[in-house]
Amino acid sequence: HGEWKKERKQKMNQTLTRKQFDILSILAEEKGTLSQRQLGEKSGHSLGTVNRVMQELTELQYVTEGEITGAGISALEPYRAKRAIFIAAGFGSRLVPITFNTPKPLVRVHGQRIIDGLIDACLDAGINEIYIVRGYLAEQFDQLLYKYPMIRFLENPVYNEANNISSAMVARYMLSNAYVFEADLLISNPKIITKYHYTSDFLAIKKDRTDDWCFIVKDGVIVEEKVGGLDCWQMVGISYWNEEDGHKLSDDIKMTYEQPGGKERYWEQVPLVFCKKHYKVEVRECQENDIIEIDTFRELKAIDKTYDV
């Protein structure tokens, strides 16, 4: 009887354990049956764990004969990414001369605008609510509406005198169940943008050493952000914020922004540095070649020869 009560309570709350989430989200993404061995490989869990979790999910009626059910899809709903915010307001000073007349996210690489790859990855993950925070040469972003009529624009009038926290200020009520992107990342593996997230997370690349912004990670959770480090995780400007954290961020961003020196902050310093007691942000691994950051005109010429004239 106790078991039944526990199961009923879990169903009412619709909270999944981490392992249940891992297996269920794989089944939802794969659109077919997978052997338990395949589930183990994809989830990183042992065969024994997969077997036990599949039994739990079957009892909860989230899985039938190895396939996810309608109830299983519903159970994943609180974990689904519902919107995406693109921070695209800045002047890409290091990419001059190109950025004198084109905002960096609209620069074309091999004929495609940088931001298009990110937007396409969102659409593939079922994320159709898309906001772009714009500032520098704002009207140029209108061209995106021909291809992506669902886009909504948020205006950042102070992009020139403040850091990207000013863009987060403009978008601060849209941060629940939301991806936040730096809009100038060239994505080469769209699969890293996933539909379901168990908790808030930040993409990063495991590094022996880096001179870049990086995270110190303990038990999968980011405990420190700094510039340069050994045995750390190099930050990639793509993060996801669950519903609860999104609500907290709307207050914390405003509070940080309004403090002395607040306008000079990077937006992610709010949850990772200044208000880090309020958050537990996990690191989500991606590989070196999943994302290409083009920081300088020289790097752009190396990637796309048409600029090398």
Each PLM stretch: what is its role?
Residues 141-213:
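Conserved beta-loop-beta/alpha segment of the NTase-like Rossmann-fold superfamily
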Residues 1-11:
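Short, Lys/Arg-enriched N-terminal segments with co-localized hydrophobic residues
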Residues 24-27, 74-134, 138:
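N-terminal glycine-rich phosphate-binding loop and ensuing alpha1 helix
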Residues 13-42:
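Short amphipathic alpha-helical interface segments
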Residues 28, 67-69, 73-84, 235-309:
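Conserved alpha/beta core of the MobA/IspD/sugar-nucleotide pyrophosphorylase nucleotidyltransferase superfamily
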Residues 58-67:
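A short, conserved structural fragment
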Residues 44-56:
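Short amphipathic alpha-helical interaction segments
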Residues 22, 189-261:
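Conserved core of the sugar-phosphate nucleotidyltransferase
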